[in-house]
Regions:
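Thiamine diphosphate
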Residues: 1-56, 111
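Solvent-exposed alpha-helices and their adjacent loops that cap or buttress functional pockets
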Residues: 11-14, 20, 38-40, 82, ...
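Conserved thiamine diphosphate
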Residues: 63-116
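ATP/pyrophosphate-binding catalytic subdomain of soluble kinases
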Residues: 95-136, 140-143
Length: 176
């Protein structure tokens, strides 16, 4: 899993600027333990996760971030498991830069990438990146109607409690 590989590269060369990319299935499912321990260790790397809430490259199975009730190839009667919330997990495990972006807002996403890369310590940017083939629920239109920037709310980044509360919202409002 990618965050484990990135962690090893950083340990081998502390001067290297490490940027790791992956998907929600790899990062939060298959590599979930690597994600947790990289955050816990506050390893100085940037982890960008394309979160499409489905295993898109393996033809549409439920992923760790799939919503309850989502019909997929592996859950034809709907997903029955609570989705993992990578933002609250990262905060609670000690990541020192935690952000969420939406791929439809390229400027905001690029700004978060720059901030994450400049940050000293573990930075994670979870990017809502709709799968146009297998996730027909969480589409670009779905996110365009709901996404709001947390910084527009004058959020205090040191307020973990409010950050977690806002990260748990996934309905009419979704904060990035």
């Amino acid at each position: 899993p990618v965050s484990g590989h990135g962690h090893r590269r950083k340990m081998a060369n502390h001067e290297m600027n490490v940027i790791v990319t992956g998907g929600d299935g790899d990062g939060y499912g298959i590599g979930g333990n690597h994600f947790t321990h990289t955050a816990r260790r506050n390893t100085d790397l940037t982890y960008i996760v394309m979160n499409n809430q489905i295993y898109g490259l393996t033809t549409g199975q439920v992923s760790p971030t799939s919503s309850i009730g989502m019909n997929t190839k592996s859950t034809p009667f709907g997903n029955v498991e609570q989705p993992i919330n990578p933002i609250t997990s990262a905060i609670m495990n000690g990541a020192t830069f935690v952000a969420r972006a939406y791929s439809g807002d390229v400027r905001h996403m690029a700004d978060l990438f720059q901030q994450g890369i400049r940050h000293k310590g573990f930075s994670i940017i979870d990017v809502f990146s709709p799968c146009v083939t297998f996730n027909l629920t969480n589409t670009h239109d779905f996110f365009k109607e709901r996404v709001k920037k947390l910084e527009d709310e004058n959020h205090d980044p040191s307020d973990w409690k409010t950050a977690c509360e806002k990260a748990m919202l996934f309905g009419d409002t979704i904060y990035t």
